[in-house]
Amino acid sequence: HLFCMPDQVKDEFKKVIDYAATQPNIPFMSVKVTGFARFSLLEKLDELMHNATGSLMKRYLHAVESLSETEKEEWHKVRLRMQQVCDEGNKKNIGVLIDAEETWIQDPVDALTILMMDVFNKSKLVIYNTIQLYRHDRLVFLKDSYQAAEERNFILGMKLVRGAYMEKEGERAATMGYVS
């Protein structure tokens, strides 16, 4: 059966970290937040964040506060799963690369990643975010992330990629009439 429950996904990511820790040539592993969270919850958070003003983290906090109590509880579990995986990477000295997602769910992924960096990247680099370079807004995001790291005193980790969703994103932008 191909579908895994989020807690099973978390446990599998932790097993990957445990294995990587025994292999000198595997210094990191990748995580997709969509393995921990309902896509529609990420979409809702992203939409709420886009309707708010301010920094990424201010918009994130506003969005989380705007969720129903049930959704807040669900999101709390997502954060806990991510924190457990990141904690395992920290304990085993294995980097955790948070993969990029589609633009319409990326903001909560970025916010969650910043939260994890703020916890785990104080004295060493453990958590990395992913920047899809085809996106027109990512240079500003990189600068804002650097500013957050300076202000909160954590080490900023970034993986730069072309972007796996480039064609899909371009088609969606053309259909919906926004800049790709």
Segments from the language model and where they lie:
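Positively charged, amphipathic and often flexible ligand-engagement surfaces
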Residues: H1-S180
